[in-house]
C-alpha cells in the first residue's frame, strides 16, 4: 500500500570501464553488482543484526529491478543508510521485541526493507512517502534528506510541517513503518468489522488528498490519509498513536471538537478502543505498552553514535 503526501528529478546513470588506474574505490559501491557486496563491515553488521536473527534483508545498494521504473530515483548515501539501519533496529525491531517478543518479529516482520535516497513524485505532484508490497517488502524514500548530525524525532507535534528541516524521522520513516506493519497484522488476523462501521459514509475514497491533516479530526480521522478508507484509517490511528505522546494525542482529539460537537473526537476514540482490543485479544499485547517503549527508545536513539557500527 502506498503512503502518499502532497508536498523533476531525473537521473541517468551510465557506466564506463576504463583501464587507466589501479586505485581501489575508497567507498563501497552503491550499485548491487559490486564485487564487495555482502563482504563489507556494514554487510556483516546487517547479517548479525537483521539477517541471521530475523531473516530480514536491507537493500541499500541501487538495484533498478527493485524500484518502480515509472520514477527516477537516486541511491541512498552510505552514512545515512548506516544511521537509519541502527535507528530502525533500536526504535522499531527492538521495541516490538521488548513488548511482544523476538519471535513476533521473526514471524511477522516484512522480509525486505529497501532504502532509496530520493523521493518518488507522481505526475500530480504528490510525493510517495513509502511503499509496501504484500507485507513482504517496505521501501523507504528520502534517506538522503536525513541529517545524521542533527537527528530530529518529533513525538509532540500531531500536525508537523512536512517541509521543515531537519526532517522529522517519525513523519518520514517510523510512522510509515508502523503503518505498514499494522497492515500485515490486519492481513494475518481479521480485525473486528465493527471498525468499518464507525466512520462509514464519511470516507473520501477519491479525494482524501484534499483533506488537510489538521482538519481531518473534525470528521473523525487522525490524518487526511486516514480518511481514504477503513483499512488505512486503522493503520493511521495505530501508527499515529504509537509515535506520539499522550499530550500530542490529546491535541488531535481536541481538534475533533468544535463548539459542542464532539462527534469527531468520539469517532477517533471509538476506533482506537477497537484497535486496542484487537491487538490485545488477537496479538497479546497492549498498545499503550508499545507506545511507552517506542517513545523511550526514540529518546534513547538521540544519544546513540550513528556514525559507527558499535
Question: What is the meaning of each model-derived region?
Answer:
Residues 2-10:
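Sec-dependent signal peptide recognition
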Residues 5, 21-102, 106, 261-263, ...:
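Acidic/polar, low-complexity intrinsically disordered N-terminal segments immediately downstream
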Residues 24-25, 82-146:
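Auxiliary, metal-adjacent structural segments of Zn-dependent hydrolase domains
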Residues 70-78, 148, 160-168, 172, ...:
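Second-shell loop/turn segments in exported
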Residues 140, 154-192, 235:
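Active-site recognition of the HExxH zinc-binding catalytic motif
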Residues 174-216:
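Acidic, glycine-rich loop-and-strand cores that form catalytic or ligand-binding grooves
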Residues 203-310:
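Metalloprotease/metallohydrolase-associated module, dominated by Zn2+-dependent proteases
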